[in-house]
């Protein structure tokens, strides 16, 4: 049961403003891995057709990629992780909720949403001294290690729309576990 009722009008905008409350903070949002934009959250007019977000504030509008090209989405312009996101492709999807609840026993679970496919994305508020322990546990349970290696990785946008047309539904949201 989600601490905040999803069916009582919780919207994408409300969730994003709680996840990223700094009005001057830059966020990177994408319609695809190749079509994205970095701006202040309030500058985005309609994110309903987007499917991705970086779970960290961006430090500047553009950075330099490892290939030496300018980009709005790269490690050079990505700040520290704000949230740690697990994507479970394995084991089977029926086991994902139990795995997430097991991690929730130790780490602060903020949000769970559908990938719009077969997996769930679980957003955690992890303290700096817990980072290594968190990833060790998450990967042991089947989380994709790619999200651990790259803090600028795209994750699924709450209530976004995947390229297959499915909404990335939020199932759980606990505003008491948000970052300050």
Kindly label every feature range from the protein language model.
Residues 4, 105-114:
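Short, glycine- and small/hydrophobic-rich beta-strand elements in well-ordered beta-sheets
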Residues 8, 60, 65-100, 126-180:
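DNA replication initiation modules
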Residues 110-117, 146-150:
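Short beta-strand
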Residues 79-80, 116-118:
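Short glycine-enriched loop/turn motifs at secondary-structure junctions
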Residues 1-83, 155, 159-161, 178:
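DNA replication initiation on ssDNA origins
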Residues 3, 107, 132-136:
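Long, low-complexity interaction regions most often at the N-terminus
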Residues 25, 108-109, 143:
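Short aromatic/hydrophobic-glycine micro-motifs
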């Amino acid at each position: 049961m989600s601490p905040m009722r999803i069916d009582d009008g919780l919207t994408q905008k409300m969730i994003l403003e709680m996840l990223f409350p700094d009005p001057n903070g830059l966020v990177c949002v994408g319609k695809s891995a190749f079509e994205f934009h970095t701006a202040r959250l309030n500058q985005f007019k309609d994110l309903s057709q987007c499917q991705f977000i970086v779970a960290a504030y961006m430090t500047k509008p553009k950075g330099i990629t490892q290939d030496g090209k300018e980009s709005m989405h790269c490690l050079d312009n990505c700040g520290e992780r704000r949230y740690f996101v697990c994507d479970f492709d394995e084991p089977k999807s029926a086991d994902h909720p139990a795995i997430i609840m097991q991690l929730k026993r130790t780490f602060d679970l903020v949000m769970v949403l559908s990938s719009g496919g077969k997996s769930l994305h679980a957003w955690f508020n992890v303290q700096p001294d817990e980072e290594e322990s968190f990833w060790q546990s998450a990967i042991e349970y089947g989380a994709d290690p790619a999200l651990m290696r790259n803090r600028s990785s795209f994750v699924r946008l709450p209530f976004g729309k995947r390229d297959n047309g499915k909404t990335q539904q939020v199932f759980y949201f606990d505003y008491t576990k948000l970052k300050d």
